[in-house]
Amino acid sequence: MKHSIIIPTLNEEEKIFQLLDFLEANALPDTEIIVVDGGSKDKTIDLAKRFKNVNLIETKRASRAFQLNEGARQAKGEILYFVHADVLPPQSFEEDIKKAISSGNDFGCYRFVFDKRALMLKFNAWWTRFDFMFCRGGDQTLFVTKDVFNKLNGFDENFVIMEDFDFILRARKQFKFRIVPKDVVVSARKYKLNSYFKVNMVNLYSYWCFMFGKSPEKIRDNYKTWLTFD
């Protein structure tokens, strides 16, 4: 089954080259690599254009759910693999995903570790091996058959944040989920710019707001107000 890797970007010049270089080196020859940019003002687009095997889709809408859906709409693969720009999958990701799907799973993710080896970050990462909803999220990457993705109508574009949680929550009600017992490597940049305690508290608050049906716009606004980003 052909795989399509879909990467949403917005001002990711610090990370996108590393990810695309890794994917070109480790993906199968027929695997499709799609970058969906939401209107970057930095060098993200120029960097993506350096890779001849990358299909770059430029949009002016900076909405991750929309970008992911647009990538999926144009993807030719039977399996979709959604990867954030600041994440590196294991070198074995192609085989891992193939095995997970062939074993009867419809969608899944990885565990993660951070690229900074602080003790408290190791504690956070440790939880991602467990099948708790709070432990999920797009940082762990997400693979899903295109058939299942289409049956769920993709990501809900009303979710301007936490679209990954919404998708997984809906998918788990109907389809079989698998956590691959290997780690992707996630950037700890958010923790470098903010305190460990602050990021965890904002994440916890955002999760409970999501679970209790609070407005995605309100969750996003609070998230951006309370945390510092690049």
Task: Cite the ranges covered by each PLM segment.
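A conserved acidic beta->alpha catalytic loop
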Residues: 37-45, 87
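Glycine-rich, basic loop-to-helix element that forms the pyrophosphate-binding segment
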Residues: 59-75
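Hydrophobic helical membrane-anchoring modules
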Residues: 172-230
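Short, well-formed alpha-helical segments that are part of the catalytic scaffolds
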Residues: 11-25
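Conserved donor NDP-sugar-binding/catalytic core segment of glycosyltransferases
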Residues: 91-119
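Short beta-strand/loop segment that forms part of the nucleotide-sugar
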Residues: 20, 30-39, 57
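Short aromatic/hydrophobic "clamp" motif used to bind/position activated sugar donors
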Residues: 80
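Acidic helix N-cap motif at the loop->helix transition within catalytic regions
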Residues: 14-18, 42-50
